[in-house]
UniProtKB/Swiss-Prot annotation:
Family statement: Belongs to the chaperonin (HSP60) family.
Stretches that traverse the bilayer: none
PROSITE patterns hit by this protein: CHAPERONINS_CPN60 (PS00296)
NCBIfam families named among the record's database cross-references: GroEL (TIGR02348), PRK00013.1 (NF000592), PRK12849.1 (NF009487), PRK12850.1 (NF009488), PRK12851.1 (NF009489)
Protein name as catalogued: Chaperonin GroEL 3
Enzyme Commission number, as recorded: 5.6.1.7
Length: 542
């Protein structure tokens, strides 16, 4: 086991604080509408330019191991805030730096670190309650657009696209962000349930110009196994022919004789029919077939349930207003499933999302949820160069998370003002002793840091701005860094999601509290006796 180096009390905290400052100073340059860019070297390809706090934090690794520990702890703040709220990473970093700085001073002057931490926790609890009480629910589309615009660093086009996407696919719908092949940013919305399986034979196509199968009001047969001959299906096929409605077959596979028979019947004009493979694999396939069945008010034909193909009747088949099948995907629009059944299934999937620990499973469950709950929107981000597209895509991702958070918990005035105003809740916090009161006061001073930093990044004097804001007591009165004007921030569209502000403060205080109560740090000693490099081989070239 390698020898370790240990640092104690003030020396440990000094080293740690230096690491915190290096990381936080790099990250906080990006805060606010006039925040600066950070350029990150890449081992291959062009450097990356970003204004995303968590992207900057993740790149920082320091040579000194003790400083690096401090930096990594604050990096954890940014990552945690990003995971929970999707935005607010820079605010969280600025708050953590402010609390650690003030806390370290108090500990050095002889305060009890544990009481300080208790005081910090009490203060954060009071401010969070105040923020929740003052959060305003989002009432219209323009407010969603404003949140998106603020989070995308003042890019109104991104805000507009996000608001339109959320309006069309609902708050639970999936919105994905991709890189476009062109210079323009565009929005594409797929309504209904779409899965990535196309027609099994091009002979099923009904619209030859677009190479697409289009059915109005079809029956949908959902079968779990392969279909290799149609003998067992004849009763249901005859019933469908008599109803003169189209039929879509979704099965694990349709092969050989069965596929040939379907194609021949289609070409002779006797049968409007198409077949596609079931989406997904293994257990996920079963779940997705069940989703389709619930959406279309059909039944999954499965031997596990004791249902045989021979005994299938028309009322076991699903129905939908429209089905469109292309080479690569199938879309079912307006299935006739009962609203209560679909809502029950959505609640079940939500519960699974809460319980799962795997990011991959969570992503797949969210896709299923969106397909049931409304649809999928794709924002394709365009730009002139690859570097520009990547930078813009970072901002769209941030803005997307921020708008979701705003819909969830409401909005607050932006620009760091909500935290400043919530400080009045600290007047009523009861503490057990003087050291805890100092902990509360640390938070009182620290919550000014985001507003100061936004002002400084915009070229103004932070202390002057904060002083002027303190003169007025209205909750939404603040300074707009974009225009340099004072006024009602709600009216000016300077708003932050309540969830983002709350999460940033809670995560910052949580990690900062741990750093303040640190008394010793242990790191591996650098080895001095490393072996010399191998000499070059002389006379060995054959």
């Amino acid at each position: 086991m390698a020898a370790k180096e240990i640092k104690f009390s003030t020396e440990a905290r000094e080293k740690m604080l230096r690491g915190v400052d290096i990381l936080a100073n790099a990250v906080k340059a990006t805060l606010g509408p006039k925040g600066r860019n950070v350029v990150i070297e890449r081992s291959f390809g062009a450097p990356r330019i970003t204004k995303d706090g968590v992207s900057v934090a993740k790149e920082i690794e320091l040579e000194d191991k003790f400083e690096n520990m401090g930096a990594q702890m604050v990096r954890e703040v940014a990552s945690k805030t990003s995971d929970v709220a999707g935005d607010g990473t820079t605010t969280a970093t600025v708050l953590a730096q402010a609390i650690v700085k003030e806390g370290a001073k108090a500990v050095t002057s002889g305060m009890n670190p544990m009481d300080l931490k208790r005081g910090i926790d009490l203060a954060v609890g009071a401010i969070v309650a105040e923020l929740k009480a003052n959060a305003r629910k989002i009432s219209n589309n323009s407010e969603i657009a404003q949140v998106g615009t603020i989070s995308a660093n003042g890019d109104a086009e991104i805000g507009r696209f996000l608001a339109e996407a959320m309006e069309r696919v609902g708050n639970d719908g999936v919105i994905t962000v991709e890189e476009a092949k062109t210079a323009e940013t565009e929005l594409e919305v797929v309504e209904g349930m779409q899965f990535d399986r196309g027609y099994l034979s091009p002979y099923f196509v009904t619209n030859a110009d677009k190479m697409r199968v289009e059915f109005e009001d079809p029956y949908i047969l959902i079968h779990e196994k392969k279909l290799s001959n149609l003998q067992s299906m004849l009763p249901v096929l005859e019933a469908v022919v008599q109803s003169s409605k189209p039929l879509l077959i979704i099965a694990e596979d349709v092969e050989g004789e069965a596929l040939a028979t379907l194609v021949v019947n289609k070409l002779r004009g006797g049968l409007k029919i198409a077949a596609v493979k079931a989406p997904g694999f293994g257990d996920r396939r079963k779940a997705m077939l069940e989703d389709i069945a619930i959406l279309t008010a059909g039944t999954v034909i499965s031997e596990d349930l004791g249902i045989k193909l021979e005994s299938v009747t028309l009322d076991m088949l699903g129905r939908a207003k429209k089905v469109s099948i292309e080479k690569e995907n199938t879309t079912i629009v307006d299935g006739s499933g009962a609203k209560s059944d679909i809502e029950g299934r959505v609640a079940q999937i939500r519960a699974q999302i809460e319980e799962t620990t795997s990011d991959y499973d969570r992503e797949k469950l969210q896709e299923r949820l969106a397909k049931l709950a409304g649809g999928v929107a794709v924002i394709r981000v365009g730009g002139s160069t690859e570097v520009e597209v990547k930078e813009k895509k970072d901002r769209v991702d941030d803005a997307l998370h921020a708008t979701r958070a705003a819909v969830e918990e409401g909005i607050l005035p932006g620009g760091g003002v909500a935290l400043l105003r919530a400080v009045k809740a600290l007047d009523n916090v009861e503490t057990a002793n003087g050291d805890q009161r100092v902990g509360v006061d640390i938070v009182r001073r620290a919550v000014e840091a985001p507003a100061r930093q936004i002002a400084e990044n915009a070229g103004a004097e932070g202390s002057v701005i904060v002083g002027k804001l303190r003169e007025k007591s209205e909750f939404s009165y603040g300074w707009n860094a974009q225009t340099g004007e004072y006024g009602d921030l709600y009216a000016q569209g300077v708003i932050d999601p309540a969830k983002v502000v709350r999460t940033a403060l809670q995560d910052a205080a949580s990690i900062a509290g741990l750093l303040v109560t640190t008394e010793a740090m242990i790191a591996e000693k650098p080895r001095k006796d490393a072996p010399p490099p191998m000499p070059a081989g002389h006379g060995m070239d054959f």
